[in-house]
Amino acid sequence: GKSTITQYFDKIGTYTNADDIVAATGMSNQEAAEFVDHKRYEAIENGEDFTFETVLSSQYKIEILKKAKESGYFIKCVFMLTVDPEVNVARVATRVASGGHDVEKSKIIERYYKAVANIPQLMELCDILHIYDNTITPVRIVRKHKDDISIFPNDLWPEAKIIELIGE
């Protein structure tokens, strides 16, 4: 999932993750989400670098990125997805079987489609954007560096599906 992949990327500035806050403090998910969002806006106000991990299924997270962009930030994003939300449902079930936290199936599916729907906005906001499919093993399907966009079709993601995904 996100946290597994996140460990392989450099974190610039302050790193915030609501799940980590819940685990460390016992805050509710909502309290932790509000806490980390406050930290992100605080970083923007202070011109500090920051990194965060999110499902990106809410417009509110896009608003954070918009605020950062308006404030002159260079935005680099790594977006992980799967070809189908049922893959995510199965992964959460595996996590629960190993003692991890559960998420309702309907919520997983809803978040999947909301997050995917945010990709065209990411294409606009991000200076650098890498989109990886993690259905089997992580495989890059989109690379955006400034105005240069490359797509990498494969068996799960044909060219037309990638073009639809990024809103081109």
PLM regions: where:
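Short, flexible loop segments at the rims of nucleotide/cofactor-binding pockets, characterized by
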Residues: 26-30, 53-54, 107-110
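Conserved beta-strand scaffold positions in the cores of enzyme catalytic domains, especially
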Residues: 15-17, 75-77, 129-131
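NTP-dependent small-molecule kinase module
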Residues: 121-168
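Glycine-rich phosphate-binding loop used to anchor ATP phosphates in small-molecule kinases
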Residues: 31-82, 115
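Short, structured coil segments at secondary-structure junctions
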Residues: 9-11, 71, 125
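A glycine- and Lys/Arg-enriched "phosphate-lid" helix/loop adjacent to the NTP-binding pocket
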Residues: 73-121
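Conserved nucleotide-binding/hydrolysis micro-motifs of P-loop NTPases
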Residues: 20-23, 57, 81-87, 136-138
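Conserved substrate/cofactor phosphate-moiety recognition/catalytic segment
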Residues: 4-50
